[in-house]
């Protein structure tokens, strides 16, 4: 006697597949963004605009003299570092007329003071000088614009670029990292957080 064989036709196979149903253990990747690290304020895309420069010196000597040149460029140096406009002025405990001069100067950025140690060498028409500051200006407007630009370049989700609410509108800090952070949410839903740092050449964002 030949063995009895049963052939499962296509319709029966389809029915069995339908009865098995979907795999309930599989889960789709979540598109929900991660929660921000803390309450913050949305940053603005508005450029703080860089000031053309300090007001023309009135009590720094004749224009083009070494003293007037240094006075003006000290202010411009602080404006460039801050990345934001302000009313500036500068005072020094010595005048830069001739010879080797070491002076202590203070640049006022609105109501903020940026002290500097200035060294100059002046001979005839030749002038070399340098200025060293230990603090820099943090401007919330500039920080916000820079962070928004980074978020846009990194394809962050719209409306997620934020910085600490406690960050002041303007303040001076020693060069290096500050207590403040900024963050945004990536297209994949993860949060990128960086620490705000004040540098001699401007604001940077460091790994938190």
Locations of the language-model features?
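Bacterial N-terminal signal peptides that target proteins for export
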Residues: 1-8
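Short, low-complexity, disordered segments immediately C-terminal to signal peptides
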Residues: 9-10, 20-41
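C-terminal motif of bacterial Sec signal peptides marking the signal peptidase cleavage site
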Residues: 15-18
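N-terminal presequence-like segments and adjacent domain-start helices
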Residues: 39-73, 130-131
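Short, non-transmembrane alpha-helical segments in secretory-pathway proteins
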Residues: 57-89, 137-166
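Serine/threonine-rich, repeat-prone extracellular segments and beta-strand-based repeat modules
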Residues: 86-104, 163-179
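A short, surface-exposed interaction/processing loop segment used at functional sites
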Residues: 125-141, 202-208
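Extracellularly exposed regions in secreted/surface proteins, prominently low-complexity, repeat-rich
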Residues: 149-208
